[in-house]
Amino acid sequence: MDKLLERFLHYVSLDTQSKSGVRQVPSTEGQWKLLRLLKQQLEEMGLVNITLSEKGTLMATLPANVEGDIPAIGFISHVDTSPDFSGKNVNPQIVENYRGGDIALGIGDEVLSPVMFPVLHQLLGQTLITTDGKTLLGADDKAGVAEIMTALAVLKGNPIPHGDIKVAFTPDEEVGKGAKHFDVEAFGAQWAYTVDGGGVGELEFENFNAASVNIKIVGNNVHPGTAKGVMVNALSLAARIHAEVPADEAPETTEGYEGFYHLASMKGTVDRAEMHYIIRDFDRKQFEARKRKMMEIAKKVGKGLHPDCYIELVIEDSYYNMREKVVEHPHILDIAQQAMRDCHITPEMKPIRGGTDGAQLSFMGLPCPNLFTGGYNYHGKHEFVTLEGMEKAVQVIVRIAELTAKRGQ
């Protein structure tokens, strides 16, 4: 389908891994390389109003080819890959007509197995694009990037009626910074879709409410031989804090609409310790209750400490559940579902146990649910995407554009 695979393989060859804890946006130079490449390709394709901001947001417009009061709609993907696993020297493997069983990843012992990933049973006969076991693939979200670019080429080269189509490619989504610098007014769409989901048919408009919790613990270190009544072990305090957190409300024990507390990192010595949690919940009241719970735990464990020893807790909200914004505009979901059905796809409405740029954008005035890309197992060496799934995503994007035009004519 019009260079879809070629585009995808080109994009994943560029190392665009983002980096957390960096002030600049984009956080890595590699993202600029892909953004500049996309800008050049958009220019060659004949799009207009192409801008690349100093914060690495690339925007462009495919002008309407029909008249009428047709709303401008947008499609958005991010160019960075996760910091969780290497994205350097990605070497994709193409497995045509998958016949089942294990797929060897490279020349080592790594395999992609239907025992661990049963979804493979549903993909027999399809073309799978996998890693070589040494890196992630980057389908999150270069599959989305390639799909949007291919959909633009299809719309540009065929007499398919559409209104103004706005596209944007953002940096640093994986570290939560991309959408913060997104100029919704300049984008000019009434609503948009991120193309950043998973398997074929996924349509997501609910995501976690999210917060980060940083805990600083200051103890008192003395020689252990003379420590009685004097030593305050910061690591012991950290252990007590974590013991108070509900063990059955962790990522590894929850699913669906269940929220969790997740101890993401902990480091320290007797003298000082730091803990970093993330809190997630779909329900706003439960989300607030989880934050209060963490404050109560810190207060309880810190009670009675010497004034020079203390526990300091800082909670920062990261993003909120976009459901409350998207459901105000039900036609956005109706059009996407109809587009999928028209492409012989059964829509699968499911909550995102995570977040997308669309969550932040929805609260910035741009309602923005999430469409599938055809990818699986993101952020690791078992990541893969199906060519057929990517082709379906292109078809759905094109059909959404066409259905929106019909509504406005």
UniProtKB/Swiss-Prot annotation:
Summarizing activity control, the record says: Inhibited by EDTA.
Chain spans, region Dimerization: 208-318
Q: Which domain of life is it from?
A: Bacteria
Q: Which GO terms describe its cellular component?
A: cytosol
Catalysed conversion reaction? Release of the N-terminal residue from a tripeptide
Q: Where in the cell is it found?
A: Cytoplasm
Q: Which UniProt keywords apply?
A: Aminopeptidase, Cytoplasm, Hydrolase, Metal-binding, Metalloprotease, Protease, Zinc
Where along the chain is the active site annotated? 80, 173 (proton acceptor)
- Please tell me where Zn(2+) 1 binds in this chain: 78, 140, 196
Task: Give the Gene Ontology MF terms in alphabetical order.
Answer: metallopeptidase activity; tripeptide aminopeptidase activity; zinc ion binding
Q: Where does Zn(2+) 2 bind?
A: 140, 174, 379
Q: Please indicate if the UniProt record lists Phosphoprotein as a keyword.
A: no
Q: Where is this region: Catalytic C-terminal?
A: 319-409
Task: Describe its function.
Answer: Cleaves the N-terminal amino acid of tripeptides. Hydrolyzes tripeptides containing N-terminal methionine, leucine, or phenylalanine. Displays little or no activity against dipeptides, N-blocked or C-blocked tripeptides, and tetrapeptides.
Its assembly, as annotated, is:
Homodimer.
HAMAP family reported for this sequence:
Aminopeptidase_M20
Cross-referenced NCBIfam families, in alphabetical order?
A: peptidase-T, PRK05469.1, PRK13381.1
In the record, the note on similarity to other proteins reads: Belongs to the peptidase M20B family.
Q: What is this protein called?
A: Peptidase T
Q: Which organism is it from?
A: Salmonella typhimurium (strain LT2 / SGSC1412 / ATCC 700720)
